[in-house]
Amino acid sequence: MEILVVAVGILVDRLTKIWALDKLKKVQDIPIIKNFFDLTYVENRGAAWGIFSGKTLVLSAVTLLVLSAIIVYMIKYRPKSKLARISLSLVISGALGNLYDRVFYKYVVDLFSLHYKDIYYYPVFNVADICVVVGTIMIAIFIVLKDDKKDGKV
């Protein structure tokens, strides 16, 4: 199951980024829902919100370290919880997707833009980012549920 989650996440991420490089890069922006959601081509040379811009080697090294830690954890402890396994697999998938970009392009391709008119723009993101965020939220839920079980609340 974990390998399937990782593979599907990477596949969807790669396909959307290949499309963005081929089509979206030429037009830069395609409005989908007026004043709310656009497809916008961005070459992100940093991390979330552009932090660590130009630090590709550092970001790649940190990503490899985190990936290694998660994989070692999954192999060593073999979590019984399906929620834990899927959430960690999503994080692995997203990390690998963005690592691929950093290694081969020296930037991460971002394409989803959420905004409110021209007043507020959330940083442009990609499928790999979605995998990491959803996986992290699921890990938090798993931890809370696990702690509640220990306390006899669940």
From Swiss-Prot:
Keywords attached to this entry: Aspartyl protease, Cell membrane, Hydrolase, Membrane, Protease, Transmembrane, Transmembrane helix
GO CC entries: plasma membrane
Compartment(s) where it occurs, according to its Swiss-Prot or TrEMBL record: Cell membrane
Catalysed reaction, written as an equation: Release of signal peptides from bacterial membrane prolipoproteins. Hydrolyzes -Xaa-Yaa-Zaa-|-(S,diacylglyceryl)Cys-, in which Xaa is hydrophobic (preferably Leu), and Yaa (Ala or Ser) and Zaa (Gly or Ala) have small, neutral side chains
Pathway(s) per entry: Protein modification; lipoprotein biosynthesis (signal peptide cleavage)
Highest taxon in the source lineage: Bacteria
Active site: D110, D129
GO BP terms in the entry: proteolysis
Membrane topology: Multi-pass membrane protein
Listed InterPro entries: Peptidase_A8
Uppermost EC category: hydrolase
EC number: 3.4.23.36
GO molecular function, one term: aspartic-type endopeptidase activity
Membrane listed as a keyword: yes
Pfam families named among the record's database cross-references: Peptidase_A8 (PF01252)
Transmembrane segments: 57-77, 86-103, 124-144
Similarity field: Belongs to the peptidase A8 family.
Function, as annotated: This protein specifically catalyzes the removal of signal peptides from prolipoproteins.
The name this protein goes by in its record: Lipoprotein signal peptidase
Organism: Clostridium acetobutylicum (strain ATCC 824 / DSM 792 / JCM 1419 / IAM 19013 / LMG 5710 / NBRC 13948 / NRRL B-527 / VKM B-1787 / 2291 / W)
Lineage of origin: Bacteria, Bacillati, Bacillota, Clostridia, Eubacteriales
